[in-house]
Amino acid sequence: MSRSMNKFSPILSYAVFAFSVSIILLCSVSVIFPALIQSVTSEFSDFPFYTPLVDPFELGVLAVPFVVLNGMILLIGIVYYKKHFSLGRLFDFDVSNRIAMIAIAIILSVYIAATVGEFAVEESWNDFSRIQSVVIDRGIENLQGFDLYVKYTLLTVSLNFFGDMRVVPFLASIALLVTTFFIAKEITKKRVPGIIAMVLVLQSNIFLSYDTSATYSNFWILFYVLSLYLILRKWQLSHMSFVLSIFSKSLSAIFLPMTMFFVLNNTKGRRRIYLTVSYGALMIAGVFAASNSNIMFGDATYLPENFTKGIESFSYQLRFDPIILIFLLPLSVMLFLKSLRGFSQANSIQVLISGFMLIPPLLITFTEQTNEPYRLIPLVVFFAVGVSTLLGKIKQDEP
């Protein structure tokens, strides 16, 4: 892997960590005190007659385990870093490619067997009727402008070949699990961390809530994660996957800054120049086309109070994913310490994690979009990848 930014790694690592930990701490406030942000930011809080309905300092359900486990893990991590204890023997273990493929096949088989029963029940999301109208009544041949061609084409294929629009989205969710394995494997150069990353995504309640949904399909996430993997493996194809992500969900376009950081932090030489110029050109072309088509500013607004609502909703939307809620902060610290030892990819993962935490509040602040939990699935993926990198021994990190 590239170490092209190592010369500036201490400054970069501190800057990335400051950005990342600030967002995580802000979002973690509602884990400990669920009503605090709302009571402070209420539009009536300045009135003398205002009385909060609940105690703003009432502890949340996960407050105690959050504080205790975070304290323990951070203490262990700092002692490990300061004392230079070696866990190399523990993380030297890996499995052969054959065993890894067998393990993946078993995991996916269990997942498929446990999920296939969902197809006996109709999808109940409110927007499902709108998706049906586009696919069945309107037809993909009548799509115009910046419509989601990729998403609706894949849904149409699913309906025509399988008789159910949810089959191909389910296959995309399986492909997302496999892609998560490969990107973690590519970063760590080991298979065990890849398997762990895949399992961490699979145990997520948010992932399992939308894995068979045609309304909120995972096409956009799959193509975006694949575009990052291709930067590391087959960079010439990365742009194609990113464009497919945009035409699966236009929200993917605002991931470009994170992609640019990933490129600069993980490539060098001609590859870096080519990817930087091409992604930069893609960004400029996208902004120009979007502004002329009135799709970028069509629902633009400014509702500053929504930013705090978006921050506050973070713990609520992840309430059934306690592993992510509790371990995000120590993961950020561990990735920071790992980056100080020369593992520059830790900075990329921190930027991706914090970026996907920040996008939902910003989206509902500057547009009329609603805050939906499915937008946190990329966070789940990169949380899993981040954890997997800690469990893999990276030779370049060792003193």
Describe each model-derived feature in a short phrase.
Residues 159-178, 210:
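Loop-to-helix entry region of an early transmembrane alpha helix in multi-pass inner-membrane enzymes
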